[in-house]
Structure formats: structure tokens, C-alpha cells
Amino acid sequence: MNLRRRMIVGGSLVVLVGLMSMPKLLFGSDQPRAKELIQQACVSCHRLEGAADSRFNLRAPDLIWAGSKYQRPWLIRWLTGKEAPLYVKGYRWDLSEGPMKHPVVTEADANAIADYFEKNNKDPRVQVGAYDVTKVTKFEAAFGGMAYKAHACLGCHTVEENGKLIGGQQSAALERAGQRYNMDWLFRFGLNPQDFVPHSGEFLADATEPQLRAVLGYLAAQGVPDFKYYEPWTAPEFGKASPGRGKVIYKEYCMQCHGATGKGDGPAAANLEPKPAIHANINFGDVPNEYLYNMINHGGAAMGKSANMPYWGLTIGQQGVADVMAYLKATFKGPK
């Protein structure tokens, strides 16, 4: 074990000494100089090409897909020593537990390296636009937090909750994931982590794609205190909502439980407990759009209500949700 520790520490010192002793002319913003810098410093620990391999065969995380993986501002901060270690127990915790100090470069050099990654280390498997972080809702992020725990992500990755760090420290810390990762890359990673780090203890969860997207929404907000959540009830579909279309959808899907006139007396209602909501007794003009949207789109169980109320969003689409909301607000005004 002592020999292994010396190997890791020694390798890190070699990289650090190499960085400090390189001629100044290597630190430039052009690609040839960046490549030379990377070859002399980074590749002693990181791979920039090759097939995915187990972390137990590596010295540090692969940079094969670094141009797709990291947000540039975070990468610059990391390379200039302004970010905390990602692996509290060490990337190769089987050899030596504890974080390793990463070599630090100047901001100019960091930008040159980032330029090189963006040009030469893109991952062709990553679809640009596969995950739209601007469409993450507060509800989705909250649900993603529950899914994160339900699928055991918390066992290996730390996150921040109520101002405290929780979770295992065996793998990458995720409490600043929203600043670090390109979400298109993280989405592809989440579809099958084994494509990136096989035989490394990474878990392939039995999660649906909507659940994965919710988990990514949760992670997108980690480390971003001013994260701007999307409000779908302000989307274009709601600007052109039609009570007339909503009435048709209400008949097709809602009437079976809530009744033709919203009295909770649809054919399915007789044997249901709890009974369906009586829409005729509700002034939907007073119901907040956020609550009404989430109830229709995500279903009763998600809102702490009856699980007999389905999550209709996948069935009727966002325009359908908007139209039903318009119909409810135009039709039901509460008891007269």
C-alpha cells in the first residue's frame, strides 16, 4: 500500500514539476501550443483518446470527451485552482484515500486548454440540444431529487440539501453539478454510464427517460442558487389556449370520473375512494396556475392527492393541458 501511495503522489509531483518548469512559450492560446502543454502535463494522468475503461485501470478521469462534458467557465476555474476537489476519497480510492492536489495553470493556459478540448475532444454520441436546461421546472427538479434518492445515486455522490452536504463520497461530488456539466453530455451519460466508465461501480438505474430528465433537472440546480426555473403555464401553448378544445378533452378524459357537469358523478366514481373532486364546487379562477398545471400534468399522487387522478401530460400534451385549464377556468366558478 505504501508503494502504491508513493506511486500516486510521485506521479502528481512529476506533473506539477513539469508544469512549473515548462518554457513560457508553451503557454499560448493557439492550438499547437495548447496541444504541447496538454501532452507534457495532462496525458501523464488523463487519457485523451481510446475506448472507455474501468477506473481501476486509469490514473485519473478520462478527458476523451472533455469538450462535450464540461461547462467552459467551470473548466477554467478548475484548471486555475479555484474549484474544490471532485473526488474527496480520491479517484483511485483503492490505492490511496484522500483528494489529490491538481496542478494549476494560468488563466491564459486554461483558456488554451479549453479551446483545444472544444475542438478536438467532442463526443459524437452526445446530441446537442438533447436536454434543454431552460425547460426545467421547480416541480421537475423536486421530483428529480426524490428519484435521485430512490435510484440510490445518493450512495456514491454528494449533493447539497438544506445547506448541508449529504451522500457518499466514493465518486464525483455533485453539489456543484449545475456549474460543471454540459447537460447534453450528462443526459447521454445517464442513459448508460457503462458506456463511459465500465466496471467502475457506476450504477445503471432502472429509470424511465422522464425520471432521468427529472434527475438532471435536480442536478442542474445544484450549485446554482439563482437557478431560473421554467414556468410552463407561461409557454406559447397557454397563450392560445381554447376552452372549446378543452371541453372536448374534458369529455374524452375527465368526464369519466368528474362527470359531465363536474359534479364528481362520472361512471368510474361510484366505487372510488377517495371520491373524485367536484369541479362544480370549485372556483377555478382562484386556483393558482402552477397548482392546476401540476395537478393535471403530473397527477394526483405527485401533488399529495389521490393516485386515481392520472398524470395526463403525456396523453394530452402541453396544448391539451392548456386547453383543459382554460375550460375549467371558463366553466366552473364555484357554488352559486
Segments (PLM) and residue ranges:
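Electrostatic cytochrome c docking/interface patches
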Residues: 21-38, 121-149, 223-249
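Extracytoplasmic electron-transfer domains, predominantly the class I c-type cytochrome c fold
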Residues: 44, 49-113, 165-166, 172-220, ...
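Short pre-active-site segment immediately N-terminal to redox-active cysteine/selenocysteine motifs
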Residues: 38-44, 49, 109, 149-155, ...
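Bacterial N-terminal signal peptides that target proteins for export
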Residues: 2-14
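Conserved N-terminal glycine/acidic-rich loop preference
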Residues: 123-133, 158-177
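Sequence context surrounding c-type heme c attachment/ligation sites in exported
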Residues: 27-43, 56, 72, 141-154, ...
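His/Cys-centered metal/cofactor-coordination and adjacent catalytic loops
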Residues: 60, 120-132, 217-242, 256, ...
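Cleavable N-terminal signal peptides
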Residues: 14-16, 25-26
